[in-house]
Amino acid sequence: LHALQHRGQEAAGITSFDGKEFHTHRAMGHVAGNFDREDIIRALPGSIAAGHVRYSTTGETSLRNVQPLYADLATGGFAVAHNGNISNAVHLRRELVQRGSIFQSTSDTEVIIHLVATSAQKSLLDRLIDALKQVEGAYSLICLTPEGMIACRDPLGIRPLVMGRLGETIIF
């Protein structure tokens, strides 16, 4: 996250999964200030994690918009970190609210969570595919689930999404 600090200076967050439960730390400010204490790092156990630095393009600058965002869905835990702009987020949000969704943030990222949660598909992967078919714009995102990590990007590949390897570790 330190290497990505230049992409967002408002806030930073990390969500990890330890095989049983998700753990999240999100805070306003820089990565160095938010993750400089050993107790914070120890509170994020697991073999899989997603981090995010925030630069607001949609939604107010507040803690409730700091990513990764997390929700307990019918299919299990679901965390998402998103880079980009969902151009039809206002329209989708309005439809979701009319159908009973209750939003906790003003971030367009939360629209993805609600689309996944309300999808009629059975599996989480099929729900995510169904959700992203409704989304317009330029984006890349990382989703954490109890089964692992899912990486997605917009159909035109406008937003960067890079995968690499560091030893035995895969990094996006």
Where are these regions (language model features)?
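Conserved short alpha-helical segments that host acidic/polar catalytic motifs at enzyme active sites
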Residues: 1-172
